[in-house]
A protein has these predicted regions:
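Right-handed parallel beta-helix
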Residues: 29-33, 103, 107-125, 207-210, ...
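Intrinsically disordered, low-complexity Ser/Thr- and acidic-rich flexible linkers and loops
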Residues: 87-90, 164-166, 178-191, 219, ...
Length: 363
């Protein structure tokens, strides 16, 4: 039973034709839905997509290096579920592999807030060698309730926030299925993203007029009581000119951030607990109080250039402490860089004397 490879051209792909291209791509994806394990090859060319493409179980989307899927509409480019279908836990469309090419949100011509790829309620999502471009307001990837996310050799280029209201937007959002977090589809059942590797990627600007580098590269801004982003590895990436903290994990467990380069970013890594409010609610809606993270390892990163915010900021609240924090063998090269550490139990720091440290409430 050999895996089947089909060429999207067989389904009527024309190039620079939003009606034909969208229809052909979805027909190919529907064929793969019926024939699990299919690889869809998208040849060199620019293909215009007017409404969201839906990718189903066990589908590989393989784009030529010179293939571009260009958004010509207001919505997302690719999602792994349908709007009114129910998906629970990690049991939605899974084993989705995407490789090569460019997913261009075309934010200059279509300045509408949305996210390039929406992956929810899934396991085993792999994205390799893809360029994401020119997002307005949203994310390159919203991984919401994904168990097993692998991102390698990708580029995340160009972001715009015309209203100034999306300062918290990350290129890659690690997310939890709660109300308001993931409007595309699926049950808001608290399914959280875990088991993640993001490596060998570049985050920066595109050459498109009006675009900027990302505010944040990778992070989370939603949580719930007793829910933790877990087993997250961010390594061998370059973050250039990020407009805020490049990495913003929220109440993670077992996080490894190493061998990254932070170049001329506003700030480096911010690791927060959840203090109160909706992120401290349980799944029944009752507010339960502060929770902190555990086992954060930040080592062998390079921080280059002026930073107006801290190179590393780790903070909790209400005397609830993060536990088991390691900061070792990082390089800091500018006198503006600093480290702020508050509310930590079991902190290990290697001899990084060449940087300003502020420590509050550490045991």
């Amino acid at each position: 039973n050999w895996p089947m490879i089909i060429n999207a051209k067989q389904f009527g792909l024309k190039g620079e034709h939003k009606w034909a291209d969208t229809r052909a791509m979805q027909k190919a994806l529907n064929y793969a839905k019926k024939n699990k394990g299919t690889t869809i090859y998208v040849p060199q060319g620019e293909y215009h997509i007017r409404k969201p493409l839906v990718i189903y179980e066990a589908t590989t989307l393989l784009l030529d290096d010179k293939a571009i899927l260009k958004r010509c509409g207001k919505d997302t480019l690719l999602k792994n579920g349908r709007r009114f279908k129910s998906y629970y836990g990690y049991n939605g469309n899974s084993h989705i592999h995407i490789a090569g090419g460019t997913f261009d949100m075309n934010g200059y011509d279509y300045p509408y807030n949305n996210t390039t790829m929406c992956m929810g309620h899934a396991c085993d999502v792999q994205i390799v060698d893809v360029t994401f471009k020119d997002v307005v307001g949203g994310h390159c990837l919203d991984a919401c309730g994904v168990n097993g996310l692998y991102i390698n050799q990708c580029k995340f280029l160009g972001f715009n926030d015309p209203d100034g209201t999306r300062f918290f937007s990350e290129a890659v959002q690690l997310d939890i299925q709660v109300s308001g977090a993931f409007p595309k589809f699926g049950a808001t059942d608290g399914t959280i993203t875990k088991n993640v590797i993001i490596e060998n990627c570049y985050f920066g600007n595109s050459e498109t007029p009006g675009m900027q580098p990302w505010n944040r590269a990778i992070g989370s801004h939603a949580s719930r009581y007793h829910k933790y982003y877990d087993n997250i590895h961010i390594r061998y990436n370059v973050f250039e000119n990020m407009k805020q903290y490049a990495l913003t994990p929220l109440k993670n467990k077992n996080t490894y951030i190493h061998h990254n380069v932070f170049k001329n970013c506003e700030g480096g890594i911010r690791f927060l607990a959840v203090k109160d409010g909706k992120n401290a609610k349980d799944m029944k809606g009752n507010e339960r109080g502060t929770q902190a993270g555990n086992n954060l390892n930040i080592f062998q990163n390079q921080f280059i250039g002026e930073m107006r915010k801290e190179a590393i900021r780790i903070q909790s609240y209400n005397n609830i402490k993060h536990e088991n924090i390691v900061i070792a063998k990082n390089e800091f090269d500018h006198e503006s860089q600093s480290v702020y550490l508050k509310d930590i139990k079991h902190l290990y720091i290697s001899n990084e004397a060449d940087i300003r440290f502020k420590k509050v409430n550490i045991d």
